[in-house]
Amino acid sequence: MTSITTIPLSTLRSSLPARPDAAAAPQRWRVADIEALYALPFMDLLFRAQQVHRANFDANQVQLSTLLSIKTGGCAEDCGYCPQSSHFETEVKASKLMALDEVMAAAQAAKDQGATRFCMGAAWSRPKERDMERVTEMVREVRGLGLETCMTLGMLEAEQAQALKDAGLDYYNHNLDSSPEFYGSIISTRTYQDRLDTLENVRGAGINVCCGGIVGMGESRAQRAGLVAQLANLEPYPESVPINNLVAVEGTPLADTPPLDPFEFVRTIAVARITMPRTMVRLSAGREQMDEALQALCFMAGANSIFYGDRLLTTSNPQADKDRQLFARLGLKVQGERPAATVQG
């Protein structure tokens, strides 16, 4: 039997517990440490990530999340990847904030399809005070269905974060998007510190943090490692980390960006799992461009949640039936449901 070659733990400062029931020691991750993880042979990296994953989660279980755009387009920010920006000519048309009954119908449909988490996104730079009453009502009503709630509304002041907490919000999403070094290449209207300040306000209100980023925007591996380092070194690191693979949309500055190598995306999932052992690593945008084998590798690397349904904000997503078929073929259980039957043949 061939042994697996690994870099010494002292070199990588691994967060892998000594025993499956042992707590991972807090640590600061250097970008160089994370680059060393990226550089591992692919099979060794996945083996490592699986060890960490199994020490903290049921490796054969995934959570289904549904994401609804409650206010689409017309955003004042100039994020180069985003078709909702008012700075770019895309097919996305601006809309007003959805009515509560429309949101509730979508939430009920998501629950009926097996989702246990419902995320609501609004294309705002930051929510206006006149909108806070409506979005907090959405949180209360969706939570009343028994769904875990998440919102992404842009930058938040401390008082707004507290209002969402008082309404019962479980998670707030505000992505870092990239490493600090690459950030200026894609966004000029919002600083990196603005994002960190919002995360601090969310954490200060006692809301769980959902924070990840986008890969495949033309960044280097070192810059991908820099993003993971930023996430892993947040104190504490996020409870939820969505990893997005760029969906290049016509009309945006990144429309012609070459796609990221698929194995590099899997490596990013694995590195996120190793550096943030107890976070929910969520396969997010870009999944429609992945074949089933690539998605299976992502689950092996430590992803344990997907966004489920036909759309992610303004981009398409694999059909729910296809996801169910894939879960059955892989023997994956959906959180909150009985295990799927194994498909033969």
Swiss-Prot record:
Entry superkingdom? Bacteria
As cofactor, the record names: [4Fe-4S] cluster; [2Fe-2S] cluster
> Which InterPro entries does the entry mention?
Aldolase_TIM, BATS_dom, Biotin_synth/BioAB, Biotin_synthase, Elp3/MiaA/NifB-like_rSAM, rSAM
Q: Which residues form the Radical SAM core domain?
A: 60-287
Q: Which UniProt keywords apply?
A: 2Fe-2S, 4Fe-4S, Biotin biosynthesis, Iron, Iron-sulfur, Metal-binding, S-adenosyl-L-methionine, Transferase
Q: Where is the signal peptide?
A: none
Q: Which residues participate in [2Fe-2S] cluster binding?
A: C119, C150, C210, R282
* Pfam families for this protein: BATS, Radical_SAM
For this protein, what is any one GO molecular function term?
Answer: 2 iron, 2 sulfur cluster binding
Instruction: Write down the EC number.
Output: 2.8.1.6
Provide the top EC class: transferase
Annotated disulfide bonds: none
Q: What pathway is it annotated to?
A: Cofactor biosynthesis; biotin biosynthesis; biotin from 7,8-diaminononanoate: step 2/2
Catalytic activity, reaction form: (4R,5S)-dethiobiotin + (sulfur carrier)-SH + 2 reduced [2Fe-2S]-[ferredoxin] + 2 S-adenosyl-L-methionine = (sulfur carrier)-H + biotin + 2 5'-deoxyadenosine + 2 L-methionine + 2 oxidized [2Fe-2S]-[ferredoxin]
Protein name as annotated: Biotin synthase
